[in-house]
Amino acid sequence: MKKAGAQSIHFKQPVGILSTASIVGSKEGEGPLAQHFDVVLSDGLLGEKSWEKAESKLVKQALELAVSKSGLKTENIDYVLSGDLLNQSIGSTFGIRELNIPFFGLFGACSTFGEAMGLGAMLIDGDFANNVLIGASSHFAAAEKQFRFPLELGTQRPLSSTWTVTGCGSAVLTKDGQGPFISEITTGKIVDMGIKDMNNMGLNNYGSQNKPILTMKRPLYGNLFIINHYFSYQ
């Protein structure tokens, strides 16, 4: 059995990450990770008439870029696993409709990309696929409209309010690759911390990701593990 413990899976043959792609908005381009993004947008609408259409276009461009960088063609991709924050995952569904690839829609909020990597790796390790395209997206303006208030209302936001990323990350997973590899995954459980502050949505992730990290027998994440361990006990 490949399952290890209650939440983890060990892959018999590590799954390779063949390529990655990322497209982000102008605000993300002002941050310390700017040099690592493939494309930084200057127009948040991407020439479209709505934020939702802009996000769909963002998804399309990012996923196509990941496939292009992999050296494969869309015909070589067995499945797409992607998700976003919008109703019916329209960012993903409209974004990939022209790719003509079997699609699994995911809705895991901030965990969507990790969820896609884990499930994609399971498909490959189980010999159900050779190549899997994954993605996750969000758009600040579309998310504000979905979860808080449309920007057009001019509603005041606290300076400490969580700011949703405008961007899409994508990757191609493969059975045969040179690495890096996905060798194991740990799936989080639902932990309801009773957070009711709509301006602090990031804190909701803390309970689910914190427990697996703290219960690890070895510090796999280097400084990240140490920092998380420190704040967990404060």
Residue ranges, per PLM feature:
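Short, well-ordered, mixed-charge alpha-helical segments that flank or form enzyme active sites
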Residues: 88-90, 140-145, 190-194
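Short beta-strand segments
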Residues: 18, 82-83, 132-138
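Active-site-proximal alpha-helical scaffold in enzymes
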Residues: 107-134, 173
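A glycine- and small-aliphatic-rich helix-loop capping segment at beta-alpha/alpha-beta transitions
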Residues: 33-36, 92-102, 124-126, 147-156
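Residue-level marker for beta-strand->alpha-helix junctions and adjacent short loops that shape enzyme
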Residues: 24, 87, 139-140, 232
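Conserved beta-ketoacyl condensing-enzyme motif
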Residues: 17, 52-111, 219-234
